[in-house]
Amino acid sequence: MVRKMKLPFLNKNTSSSSFSSNSSSSSSSWPWPSSHQQNLKTISSKASFIVNKPKDVYEPEPPPRSFSSSPSSSSYSSFSSTSHAIENPPEIESIENVIKGLKSSKRLIFERRGTSNSILEEATKRDDHEEEEDGLMLLSLESNDPYTDFKNSMEKMVEVHVLHHDWISLEKLLFWFLKVNVKASHRYIFAAFVDLVLNLAVGPSKDVAGEPNSDVVVEDSLSSSWPVSLYSSSDENSSTSVRFLPETSIGEKGRDVCCLSSLFELEEKIKDNIDPNDYVSS
């Protein structure tokens, strides 16, 4: 009796051949292309696009020509004018011409109010203008003899405004001298004012006709021998004297008896910034 022996390698070849035949039949029967073929096709199309792209960018196709008369001529003229404007741009306007145009159109207004742009200068000019409106003009001088200068200036004011018997006006005069001068000059002002009042009380006074007083020494306040100075030194030999030059006659004439009030009380009132018009001697 003969037995059939099963050989494994024979079965393997048979199965492999059958698998290959099945795969070939399945591949032939599959209607869609494989992914490998699709990828190859996509890459090739991209490569062709990359190759053709520079040609499309750097070599533009010429515009189509039209045989009509008016539209073609207008389009050609516009194209030529645009190209001419690009090739020849307008010249940039210079800075000097721009500034001249702004000045002519009054957009830039240049005002020079003084020698500098200092706020203190404007405040000083404003104060001087107010003092001129009140009938007085402030003059600052650097003097080597402040007592004599203060006394002569006070005598000038008394002589011009006829303040011989008007004690209220004399007190206002002393008030303004103390106000506009530094504290180091107050002792010279007090001494000059006391001597002025004593001379007015003892010496012959001015009559109604307007005859000058023989005891009053008048000196021109605008003498050029003193240099003009804004600030004064605290030295005893040199101080700044500030005078009032008369412009219009102020005050009222009277024949009240002169009496010297407390000068120290008046100085305290000056420190408290009291208006001299409200101050009346007791």
Swiss-Prot record:
BP GO annotations:
negative regulation of DNA-templated transcription
Q: Name the source's superkingdom.
A: Eukaryota
For this record, the Gene Ontology CC terms, alphabetical, are:
nucleus
Q: Where is the composition biased (Polar residues)?
A: 36-47
* Tissue distribution of the protein: Expressed in roots and shoots.
Q: What are the Low complexity biased-composition ranges?
A: 15-35, 66-85
List residues of the OVATE domain: 139-199
The record's annotation in PROSITE patterns points to: OVATE
- Job of this protein: Transcriptional repressor that regulates multiple aspects of plant growth and development through the regulation of BEL1-LIKE (BLH) and KNOX TALE (KNAT) homeodomain transcription factors.
Q: Under which name does UniProt file this protein? A: Transcription repressor OFP18
Q: Which organism is it from?
A: Arabidopsis thaliana (Mouse-ear cress)
The gene that this protein is the product of is: OFP18
